[in-house]
C-alpha cells in the first residue's frame, strides 16, 4: 500500500464515523503549496463555508501559502465564515493527514476564533 492509499483509507474510516454520528465536518486538505478547509453539512451534501490559501484575501495576509502561518490564516477565516452561517460546533476531519504542523495550526486558529471541536 502506498502512502496516498494509506491516507485515503484512514480518511474513509474517520468520515464513516462522522457520518454515523451526524456531525457537521470541518474538512482539511493539504498540498505542498496550499491548504484548503471546508465546513460540510451533516448530510454531506452541502458546503456551508470554505477558505483556502488560493483566495486573494488570504494571499494578501501571508507571504507564503505553504506554511503554518498561512494555515492559521485559513483557520481563522473558516471559523469566521462558519460562525456567520450559524455553525458553532463541528467535527474535525483531517482527511487522514497527521495532526501536526499546518493541520494543527489550522485547527488551533479555528478554535481560537470561536469554532468548537
UniProtKB/Swiss-Prot annotation:
The keyword Ribonucleoprotein applies. GO terms for cellular component: cytosolic large ribosomal subunit. Keywords: Ribonucleoprotein, Ribosomal protein, RNA-binding, rRNA-binding. Pfam families: Ribosomal_L18p. InterPro entries: Ribosomal_uL18_bac-type (IPR004389), Ribosomal_uL18_bac/euk (IPR005484). Transmembrane segments: none annotated. It comes from the Bacteria. The keyword RNA-binding applies. Coiled coil: none annotated. GO terms for biological process: translation. One of its GO terms (molecular function) is structural constituent of ribosome. HAMAP family: Ribosomal_uL18_B. This is one of the proteins that bind and probably mediate the attachment of the 5S RNA into the large ribosomal subunit, where it forms part of the central protuberance. Belongs to the universal ribosomal protein uL18 family. Part of the 50S ribosomal subunit; part of the 5S rRNA/L5/L18/L25 subcomplex. Contacts the 5S and 23S rRNAs. PANTHER family: 39S RIBOSOMAL PROTEIN L18, MITOCHONDRIAL, LARGE RIBOSOMAL SUBUNIT PROTEIN UL18M. This is Large ribosomal subunit protein uL18. The gene is rplR.
Amino acid at each position: 500500500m502506498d502512502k496516498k492509499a494509506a491516507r485515503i483509507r484512514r480518511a474513509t474510516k474517520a468520515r464513516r464515523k462522522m457520518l454515523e454520528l451526524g456531525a457537521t465536518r470541518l474538512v482539511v486538505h493539504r498540498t505542498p503549496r496550499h491548504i484548503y478547509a471546508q465546513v460540510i453539512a451533516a448530510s454531506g451534501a452541502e458546503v456551508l463555508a470554505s477558505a483556502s490559501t488560493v483566495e486573494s484575501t488570504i494571499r494578501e495576509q501571508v507571504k507564503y501559502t505553504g506554511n503554518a502561518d498561512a494555515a492559521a490564516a485559513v483557520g481563522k477565516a473558516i471559523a469566521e465564515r462558519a460562525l456567520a452561517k450559524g455553525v458553532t460546533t463541528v467535527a474535525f476531519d483531517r482527511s487522514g493527514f497527521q495532526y501536526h504542523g499546518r493541520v494543527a495550526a489550522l485547527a488551533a486558529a479555528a478554535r481560537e476564533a470561536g469554532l468548537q471541536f
